[in-house]
Design a protein with these regions (language model features):
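ATP-dependent carboxylate-amine ligase catalytic core
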Residues: 2-13, 17-111, 115-141
C-alpha cells in the first residue's frame, strides 16, 4: 500500500501533475487510490475527482485541527489500496507564510506520512543538493 505526501519547495513545482500521474498509475493497477489536499483548496481535488475519477478530500489543520484531520484521513482513506496527499505552496509554508502551522510538513507529521518532493531542476545542479539537504534538515522529523 502506498501512503505519502507530495510536496515541493514552492508553488508551481509540479505537485499536482505528479499527484495526478501517481493517482492514475495506482488506479490503473487496481490499487483503489484516495487523494487528499492540504488546506481549503478546492481546485486540485476537482482535478483528482473529475479528471481521474478518484475520491479527493481536504485536510485543513487550521479549520479542523489535528484530531479531526486524523479522523478524516482514517474515515476516507481507511481500507483504500493507496493514499496520495498533496501539499500546498512550499513544504513548510503554513499560515500567513510565517509559520509551519497547517503546512504540508505539519500535515505529514500529524499523519505520519513520508514525503515525496516535486521540483523544477532547470538551470541548477549542485544547488539542488543544498536545497534538498535544507528541506530535510529544517524540521525534525522531516
Amino acid at each position: 500500500m502506498v501512503e505519502l505526501m507530495i510536496s515541493a519547495p514552492a508553488s508551481g513545482s509540479g505537485k499536482t501533475v505528479l499527484a495526478c500521474a501517481l493517482l492514475a498509475a495506482l488506479k490503473d493497477r487496481g490499487l483503489d487510490p484516495c487523494a487528499f489536499k492540504c488546506g481549503p483548496d478546492y481546485i486540485d481535488p476537482m482535478f483528482h475527482r473529475s479528471a481521474l475519477g478518484v475520491d479527493s478530500h481536504n485536510l485543513d489543520l487550521f479549520l479542523a485541527g489535528e484530531d479531526r484531520v486524523r479522523g478524516l484521513y482514517r474515515r476516507y482513506g481507511g481500507g483504500r489500496g493507496s493514499i496520495v496527499a498533496e501539499g500546498a505552496m512550499g513544504f513548510y509554508d503554513g499560515l500567513g507564510g510565517t509559520t509551519d502551522r497547517a503546512s504540508a510538513w505539519h500535515t505529514a507529521h500529524t499523519l505520519d506520512l513520508p514525503g515525496l518532493m516535486a521540483g523544477r531542476p532547470k538551470g541548477a545542479s549542485l544547488t539542488l543538493a543544498a536545497q534538498i539537504r535544507g528541506l530535510t534538515a529544517f524540521r525534525t522529523p522531516s
